């Protein structure tokens, strides 16, 4: 079996990626998914909410919004170019946090009492000069940021995602569903799941390990949590 250190080194080279999967024989692969109340996911949803609100009013808005979330604080910063005038960033942020489920100080975060700081400035005019529509050419001339991404689809699941991450997503999505439906009122918004799948010659062979971690109210017992999650 390929050693884990060798596994990670070889994955950086795309031309041997499939060779590693096929030649490594039996190996374990773990993926993690976090719920909507995890700080990283909260920050993503707030930044997405800012973008959506601006695009609804001005479809040509350019938004570079970063969000930091920590206990009792949501901080938004970045640069924005938009003709939208009616976006209330503070209330928008509080409503997103409320929808996630943070409505009680006991959870360590409360949509109504948390501090929301806004540091959103106009985008540099130098960037605007480079990317705004050019009337002489009748088209846009560039982008304000650049990125190079790659990925692939696989046939392990119906959503064309690798089995470990697909299963981890399903678990945290189900936890969120039962919490929002009131089936488990002791569940709080922050949670995560890790799923380890054993592969044989590049194909899923069996589920090796499942880890589920979730915030909860202090009165619920560990035995009750375990029985509920297993069910």
Question: Where in the sequence are the language-model features?
Answer:
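Short, charge-patterned binding micro-sites
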Residues: 64-82
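Short, structured active-site "lid" loops
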Residues: 80-93
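Glycine-rich, mobile lid/loop segments that gate access to catalytic sites or pores
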Residues: 30, 91, 96-231
């Amino acid at each position: 079996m390929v050693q884990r250190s060798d596994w990670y080194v070889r994955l950086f080279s795309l031309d041997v990626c499939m060779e590693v999967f096929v030649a490594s024989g039996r190996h374990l692969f773990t993926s993690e998914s976090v719920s909507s109340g995890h700080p990283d996911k909260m920050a993503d949803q707030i930044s997405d909410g800012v973008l959506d609100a601006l695009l609804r009013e001005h479809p040509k808005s350019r938004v570079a919004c970063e969000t930091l979330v920590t206990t009792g604080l949501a901080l938004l910063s970045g640069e924005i170019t938009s003709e939208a005038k009616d976006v209330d960033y503070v209330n928008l942020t509080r409503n997103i946090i409320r929808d996630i489920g943070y409505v009680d100080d006991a959870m360590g975060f409360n949509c109504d009492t948390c501090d929301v700081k806004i540091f959103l400035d106009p985008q540099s005019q130098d960037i605007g000069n480079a990317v705004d529509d050019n009337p002489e050419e009748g088209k846009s001339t560039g982008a304000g940021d650049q990125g190079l991404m790659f990925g692939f689809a696989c046939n392990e699941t119906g959503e064309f995602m690798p089995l470990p991450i697909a299963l981890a997503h399903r678990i945290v999505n189900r936890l969120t569903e039962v919490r929002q439906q009131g089936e488990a009122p002791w569940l709080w918004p922050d949670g995560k799941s890790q799923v380890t799948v054993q592969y044989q010659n590049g194909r899923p062979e069996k589920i090796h390990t499942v880890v589920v971690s979730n915030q909860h109210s202090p009165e619920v017992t560990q035995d009750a949590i375990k029985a509920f999650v297993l069910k």
